From Swiss-Prot:
A motif ('KMSKS' region) lies at residues 239-243. It holds the Pfam family tRNA-synt_1c. NCBIfam families: gltX_bact. The gene is gltX2. This is Glutamate--tRNA ligase 2.
Length: 440
C-alpha cells in the first residue's frame, strides 16, 4: 500500500514551504488510495512546543488535509536507541569529541587546500583510554554514522537519476552529546517501521537522502521512493527563508485567503501545468502528476493568492455562505440577493461586512461641488425604501427629465452620492438592498 508522511517539527508555525511538502505527500497517498501519516518530529525537547503541535493540526484541518494517523517521535525514543545499538554492533557507529571550534578550523583548512570540507574521521583513531579522557574533559561525544565511501544512486521522482559520492559527504552526526536523537536516524527508523513507500521533500534534502539510504541498508532495509521538489523563492528570486514570517499559513488564513485558492496554487506552482482554481481537493488530486514538476527554483508571490481567492468566491453558491451572511445581520429575504450582488465585488469574505455596512447605513456621499444642487434635487425625488428592481430606472428617468442630464453626467454623480464609490455593483441592484434613503 502506498504510504506517505508529512513530518513537521513543532518548533514554529507552518508556512507555504511546509505546505508544499505536505500537499504533495497527501495527494500521492490519496490518489493511490493509500495512507497519509502526520508525524510530529519532536525529538528536540528545548524547541518543540505543544502549541505548535496544535497549530500544525489546526492549519492542516483548515486546508482539509486529513491524516489517517498521527505519530510522535518523542514517544519512539526506544526504537531509535535500538537502531543505534544495531549500528554500533555492525561497526557503523562511532563516537567523536571535536568541539565546534575544532571542526570549524578543520573545515577552513580543507577549504584553503582546495578540498571539500568533509569530516576527517580522526575519532576513529582514538584508543579507549583517549576516549575516556575526552569524556572526562568534555562529556559524552556525538555519534557519527560511518559512511561506505561509494557512490549512492537512486532515481528521483522529480530530479531523475541521482548519484552522490559518499566520500564527498561527512559522516553524519545521528546522536548529539546530550543524547538527543537527530532527524536523520529518527526519520530512517520511522520510515522503515511505518512502511513509508514514498518520501517527497525539498531539494535541500538531497544529500541527506543519500546518507539515509546507506543507514537504511546498514539496518537491513530497502529505501522508499524519493522525490525532491524545488525550493520556493520570492517573486524576484530572493530567498524565501527571510520572508517566511509573513507567509505562515495562520497569517494567510487571517488575511482571508480561501483554502482552495492556496491549495490550487501550491498544487501547480513549479509544474508545467497552468494554475487553475479547483473546486475541491478531489479535483486537485485527480490532476496531480509529480512528473510535471521541475528542478528549477519556484517563484512564489503571495499577491497571487488574492485574485485566486476572489475567483473562488465569485463561483461560490449562496448555500455555502448563508450562515456568514445571516451573522452580518442581512435580512433573510435579502440575503441571497446580497450575496449575488456582493460576491463579484469582493476579494475575501471579510469584504462582505463593508458592503453590508454600505447597504445598511448608506455610503459616505462623494459629491463634487458643482453636482451638489443636482444631487440634492435628485434625493428629494427619491421615495423612502424599500426599493424594488424598477426603482433605479424610474428614479433616474425622473431626474433626467427634470435636470436635462443624461449618460455619465446623470448616472455617475448619483452612483457616487449613493455609494461613495466610483464603481461597484449595478445600481439597480444596489437600490434594492438599501435599508435607508440616501442623504447628503
Amino acid at each position: 500500500m502506498t504510504t506517505t508522511r508529512f513530518a513537521p517539527s513543532p518548533t514554529g508555525y507552518l508556512h507555504v514551504g511546509n505546505l508544499r511538502t505536505a500537499l504533495f505527500n497527501y495527494m500521492i497517498a490519496r490518489k493511490a488510495g493509500g495512507t497519509f501519516i502526520l508525524r510530529i518530529d519532536d525529538t528536540d525537547p528545548e524547541r518543540s512546543k505543544p502549541e505548535y503541535v496544535d497549530a500544525i493540526q489546526e492549519d492542516l484541518t483548515w486546508l482539509g488535509l486529513t491524516w489517517d494517523r498521527i505519530e510522535y517521535q518523542s514517544r519512539r525514543l526506544d526504537r531509535y536507541a535500538e537502531a543505534a545499538d544495531a549500528l554500533r554492533a555492525a561497526g557503523r557507529f562511532y563516537e567523536a569529541f571535536e568541539t565546534p571550534t575544532e571542526l570549524d578550523l578543520k573545515r577552513k583548512k580543507q577549504l584553503n587546500m582546495g578540498r571539500p570540507p568533509v569530516y576527517d574521521r580522526a575519532a576513529l583513531a582514538l584508543s579507549e583510554d583517549e576516549k575516556a579522557a575526552l569524556r572526562a574533559e568534555r562529556g559524552q561525544g556525538v555519534w557519527r554514522f560511518k559512511l561506505d565511501h561509494e557512490r549512492i544512486t537512486w532515481t528521483d521522482g522529480i530530479l531523475g537519476d541521482i548519484s552522490i559520492d559518499a566520500a564527498s559527504v561527512s559522516d553524519p552526526v545521528l546522536i548529539r552529546g546530550d543524547g538527543q536523537v537527530l532527524y536523520t536516524i529518527a526519520s530512517v527508523v520511522d520510515d522503515t517501521e511505518m512502511g513509508v513507500t514514498h518520501v517527497v521533500r525539498g531539494s535541500d534534502h538531497v544529500t541527506n537522502t543519500a546518507t539515509q539510504i546507506q543507514i537504511m541498508a546498514a539496518l537491513g532495509h530497502g529505501h522508499p521512493e524519493f522525490a525532491h521538489h524545488s525550493l520556493l523563492t520570492g517573486p524576484q528570486g530572493e530567498a524565501l527563508s527571510k520572508r517566511l514570517g509573513t507567509l505562515a499559513l495562520r497569517d494567510l488564513r487571517a488575511e482571508g485567503i480561501e483554502p482552495m485558492a492556496l491549495l490550487s496554487l501550491m498544487a501547480r506552482l513549479g509544474s508545467s501545468q497552468p494554475v487553475e482554481v479547483a473546486g475541491s481537493l478531489e479535483a486537485l488530486i485527480e490532476g496531480f502528476d509529480l512528473s510535471t514538476f521541475g528542478a528549477a527554483p519556484t517563484k512564489f508571490d503571495r499577491a497571487d493568492l488574492f485574485p485566486l481567492t476572489a475567483r473562488l468566491l465569485h463561483a461560490t453558491p449562496f448555500a455555502e455562505v448563508a450562515d456568514e451572511i445571516a451573522a452580518l445581520g442581512v435580512p433573510a429575504a435579502q440575503a441571497e440577493l446580497f450575496w449575488e450582488v456582493a460576491r463579484a465585488n469582493i476579494t475575501t469574505r471579510a469584504d462582505l461586512a463593508g458592503w453590508w455596512q454600505l447597504f445598511r447605513d448608506g455610503g459616505a456621499p462623494l459629491v463634487a461641488e458643482e453636482d451638489r444642487a443636482f444631487v440634492a434635487d435628485a434625493f428629494a425625488r427619491l421615495p423612502e425604501p424599500p426599493y424594488g428592481p424598477e426603482t433605479w430606472g424610474a428614479w433616474t428617468a425622473e431626474v433626467k427629465a427634470a435636470s436635462g442630464r443624461k449618460g455619465k453626467g446623470l448616472f455617475m454623480p448619483l452612483r457616487k452620492a449613493v455609494t461613495g464609490l466610483e464603481r461597484g455593483p449595478e445600481m439597480a441592484d444596489v437600490m434594492r438592498l438599501l435599508q435607508k434613503k440616501p442623504t447628503l
